[in-house]
């Protein structure tokens, strides 16, 4: 057989495999919808519309208003499982989830499909009574009965999928929802559905980055479809759905979408509080913490990491006991800052205090890093700090989880209060940015796409004394996008 014949055969086999998989996934969606019609019929029999329709009151939480405004908005989701991932969150504590989302979300999505998502309509009132935001009922809506049922259980909005509904069905469900002052998230996944959404006058259009035929995600779908929505329906709110895991992805898509619906990536994280901060604000650190009150201020402002400096000459130096006391102030992920210390000493401090990362601020070379890696507990990250004057430093290649770039003034790196030339950053994907960050430049710095910002002297009233107002102002600036 010729090589070209072999390649052609391979391509044909792959094409058949893909077509078969797409057909299988299309059948999965079709089966979900068939099952939903059966569910509706059974639910109508056990909970007839006449038993609650006359008691329905219009929603008093506007979904449309909640998603309007200049800032990027977030719809955070309560999702226990999904067909593509199976069980996502074993400890599905709705009270805890709602308490976290209440501090960050603009609207909250609740999965109510029982068979495929392990959801329930009973989840809606449980969430709604604990939050101030409008609550979205996310289900495979195929009948106006479901809209009324969603409102009966407290939903302020519903999801309508154009991959499931034809135009006539959509209009019927839309009329039912709007009659109760409920909002609608109209979901599209391709160009044809997009044009239908525009023709139907959808006010909030969700672009599903997941291919419903093979369950893969592609964030470029938002980039491809959003400009058409902007052109044809400039007043519509565009929401990017599925596949959002990092703040860098959010920043990348923020120029295309007005907001994001995020579920699976948050639900998979044990520490939901920090997970929401990471995706909405970035993985930001407040360094130079010396007191539990300051740790609490950093945490309340929105930090993910807290820095403890074990360098004696620093104005913000801590020893083991003061570090332990400081850590009692807030459940941050704590980073120990060291400079040319013995590897055994660093490993001992990290292990004893349960630090999440080590930040090396001295002349530590690759050999030192490699040795330290073998001494640290599994999962502890190593960050390497580099002083930046007027040229980009050479970054170590191996066993470094993050590179921290800080301003260098003379021979001093860190704690200078100076800003270096940010054009020297290069690829920001593994960079923590430090050096002279303050409420005045935090918004600009956050636009650079780094993993996170490292705040210190710019949010202090005195060395080692964090200022609550400056911290709040800095994180407000970071969130202002």
UniProtKB/Swiss-Prot annotation:
Pfam families per record: IGPS (PF00218), PRAI (PF00697)
Could you give a single Gene Ontology term from the biological process aspect?
A: L-tryptophan biosynthetic process
Q: List the disulfide bonds.
A: none
Gene3D superfamilies xref list: Aldolase class I
Q: Give the EC number(s) listed in the UniProt record.
A: 4.1.1.48, 5.3.1.24
InterPro entries per UniProt: Aldolase_TIM, Indole-3-glycerol_P_synth, Indole-3-glycerol_P_synth_dom, Indole-3-GlycerolPSynthase_CS, PRAI_dom, RibuloseP-bd_barrel
Region Indole-3-glycerol phosphate synthase, residue ranges: 1-283
Q: Which reaction(s) are listed as its catalytic activity?
A: N-(5-phospho-beta-D-ribosyl)anthranilate = 1-(2-carboxyphenylamino)-1-deoxy-D-ribulose 5-phosphate; 1-(2-carboxyphenylamino)-1-deoxy-D-ribulose 5-phosphate + H(+) = (1S,2R)-1-C-(indol-3-yl)glycerol 3-phosphate + CO2 + H2O
User: Which molecular function GO terms apply here?
Assistant: indole-3-glycerol-phosphate synthase activity; phosphoribosylanthranilate isomerase activity
Q: Where is this region: N-(5'-phosphoribosyl)anthranilate isomerase?
A: 284-481
Whether Isomerase counts among this entry's keywords is yes
Q: Which UniProt keywords apply?
A: Amino-acid biosynthesis, Aromatic amino acid biosynthesis, Decarboxylase, Isomerase, Lyase, Multifunctional enzyme, Tryptophan biosynthesis
Metabolic or biological pathway: Amino-acid biosynthesis; L-tryptophan biosynthesis; L-tryptophan from chorismate: step 3/5; Amino-acid biosynthesis; L-tryptophan biosynthesis; L-tryptophan from chorismate: step 4/5
Describe its assembly: Monomer.
Family classification = In the N-terminal section; belongs to the TrpC family. In the C-terminal section; belongs to the TrpF family.
Q: Tell me the function of this protein.
A: Bifunctional enzyme that catalyzes two sequential steps of tryptophan biosynthetic pathway. The first reaction is catalyzed by the isomerase, coded by the TrpF domain; the second reaction is catalyzed by the synthase, coded by the TrpC domain.
PANTHER family cross-referenced by the UniProt entry: INDOLE-3-GLYCEROL-PHOSPHATE SYNTHASE (PTHR22854:SF2), TRYPTOPHAN BIOSYNTHESIS PROTEIN (PTHR22854)
Please state what the protein is called: Tryptophan biosynthesis protein TrpCF
Query: From which organism does this entry originate?
Result: Vibrio parahaemolyticus serotype O3:K6 (strain RIMD 2210633)
Gene assigned in the entry: trpC
